[in-house]
């Protein structure tokens, strides 16, 4: 996982058929968060056995629907011989759709602006269908804000001196894959389940004695409450991170944390605009 910087691995049996799947979250929750030593735990003990799979001829819509209904981020794909063909990542699928939406908006906006110029010169009316189309795309591009997806609970925080083991236990207890790190009341970093795997387990550090300040990401980005979900996803995609703290600019307080999976689920219906 560390070498490939992946957070999901498929497990095969002796016949090279899919036997299970495990993720960075599984390692953080089921190993470190459970107080176990990674060297003493086998993959079979923590993996999800016999995961649901899609087939290569499964439609993208059906695969996406399955992932949303089951709460999966990753979905293995098999061919007609039940051999592994690949793995779908719902967030990457969504980014592709988001870029498609952005391109549609850009090209439609150019057409809209051109028609405005024609109207100004000739006094002709713009085709109503074009106006409606551009407005529909614009609304999907702006979309709901981050405030609409927050649950009202503040993000879980730890101090810079908290051990990785304690941090992983807090993740498990609070059903979150990211914690904010505080030093003297100020947010100085963010620590995630992926950090547990790549920066602690893979590096051979002891979670019980390693403090989060050694392995956290310092000075995380923040987003305002009124940022659109689409803008937040673009920010996360460009910054190569999966979690984003949300700040109320009026009170200067951090009021929540969103992750890429939650935002993807919240906006899937927005990329279903026909004929994009």
Q: Can you say where each PLM-predicted feature lies in the sequence?
A:
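Tandem CBS (Cystathionine beta-synthase) repeat/Bateman regulatory domains
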Residues: 1-276
